[in-house]
Amino acid sequence: MQTLKLKHLVAVRWFHWINFPLLFIMIWSGILIYWAFPIYRIGPFRFFPAWVYSTLHIDHRLANGMALHFVFMWLFVVNGVLYVAYTFISGEWRMLVPRSLDTFRDAWYVVLHDLHLRGDPPVQGKYNAAQQVTYTAIVAMGIGSVLTGLAIYKPAQLAWLTMLFGGYRGARLVHFALTIGYILFFVVHVVQVMLAGWNNFRSMVIGWEVSDETGRSGLKTEDSLVK
């Protein structure tokens, strides 16, 4: 028997959909800024080849990138702070933060299952182990982005913070690495949403999902095991 089940409260959905365009703008404007001093390489190759900049028309737009970055970074920070505060006030953090080291093992099992290398579907609550590890890591990455961003933005006034990351270049390297991490997360996240189907996507739009005895997408849940 199928029933409607509330999965995501309105506050969580708002934070999610506000963060999506903000993060996109921050990444995009960050690449516009990076163009002016593209120092990172993979061996002999630049991280972003010249054709990437010309194809996407993001070359010679340093001023635009800085203007966008310095405006939207405050909105990104405010949205992130409010989200973290909400998770603690509402108790949502209990479902998001890994409870023990076993969660990391279970997260690996989830990855193997998603790659069709493990037959047994993992037991999950509202979030599976891989989601708990990933979403907690994203929050930590957000904090890292803010700190390294401030270290780059005000290296003289916040010299102590800049030095914590090994100086200006160290802070910029960490900031850049975190940005690449966001891009990789976004790609995997979109693929996972597509594989999970409309029911999962709808729950993040309207808050409700269609549930049955075996749980969403046929995965066993803690509730169904109790029954």
Stretch-by-stretch model annotation:
Residues 1-227:
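Membrane-embedded alpha-helical bundles that constitute the cytochrome b-like, heme-associated redox core
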